[in-house]
């Protein structure tokens, strides 16, 4: 199926230490970027959350403390991730209530200006199925 895009869109998913966007941390972010010319770019960043990953969270996504202990923290990747999604619409499952708020919190903690996210358009596929 060919999408008729007016601007690039990034489908993204986070794996995290929990479900609280204000306090929990990202341990992995995966992004599929679709350009208007159908070009696709996939990126995955494994991230050290700098705190223990609860067993409950690891049982869901399979990422353990051992797997991230030697990975850089979010701040290390923050500019690269921001540049990758800058100017794109964003899409995913539950992005409006969880993924995007948590991502914005991580950017704020990394001193990234998040004012551009005020204007970002999102497609939250969770709303399609509710």
Q: Can you say where each PLM-predicted feature lies in the sequence?
A:
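Conserved non-catalytic scaffold segment of RNase H-like nuclease domains
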Residues: 1-119
């Amino acid at each position: 199926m060919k999408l008729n895009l007016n601007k690039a869109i990034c489908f993204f998913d986070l794996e995290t230490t929990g479900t609280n966007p204000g306090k929990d941390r990202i341990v992995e972010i995966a992004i599929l970027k679709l350009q208007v010319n159908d070009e696709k770019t996939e990126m995955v960043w494994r991230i050290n959350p700098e705190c223990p990953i609860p067993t409950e969270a690891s049982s869901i996504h399979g990422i353990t403390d051992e797997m991230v202990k030697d990975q850089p923290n979010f701040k290390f990747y923050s500019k690269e991730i921001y540049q990758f999604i800058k100017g794109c619409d964003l899409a995913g499952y539950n992005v409006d209530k969880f993924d995007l708020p948590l991502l914005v919190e991580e950017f704020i903690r990394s001193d990234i200006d998040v004012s551009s996210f005020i204007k970002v358009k999102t497609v939250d596929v969770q709303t399609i199925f509710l």
